[in-house]
Amino acid sequence: MPRVKRGVTARARHQKIFALAKGYRGRRKNVYRVAKQAVMKAGQYAYRDRRQRKRQFRQLWIVRINAGTRENGLSYSKFMNGLKRASIEIDRKVLADLAVFDKAAFAQLVEKAKAALAA
């Protein structure tokens, strides 16, 4: 049985890492050992940040809704409670969009929430 030389597989493995490290600065793009570490770390950041992105967008939506409700004389928590009591099921993403781009429609929602809280 002939001995297996690793030239082809090693080169393929290195090329795969270098392709992933394309665009990196310094030795991170052309030294295999450093590039491999950089790609691994990038993968960890990507994994973590895919989860953080969901949290950050929810925070952004809440900030925008809060700003819109305070313009109409209500706090965020009371507004959300009012919507729940009024049986209005609109998610925060859509509410934030309304608060920024359609202030009239958002003001009507705030009035409905106020009415539901008063009742």
Swiss-Prot record:
One of its GO terms (cellular component) is cytosolic large ribosomal subunit. InterPro entries: Ribosomal_bL20, RIBOSOMAL_L20_CS, Ribosomal_protein_bL20_C. GO terms for biological process: ribosomal large subunit assembly; translation. Pfam families: Ribosomal_L20 (PF00453). Keywords: Ribonucleoprotein, Ribosomal protein, RNA-binding, rRNA-binding. One of its GO terms (molecular function) is structural constituent of ribosome. Belongs to the bacterial ribosomal protein bL20 family. Binds directly to 23S ribosomal RNA and is necessary for the in vitro assembly process of the 50S ribosomal subunit. It is not involved in the protein synthesizing functions of that subunit. This is Large ribosomal subunit protein bL20. It comes from Neisseria meningitidis serogroup B (strain ATCC BAA-335 / MC58). The gene is rplT.
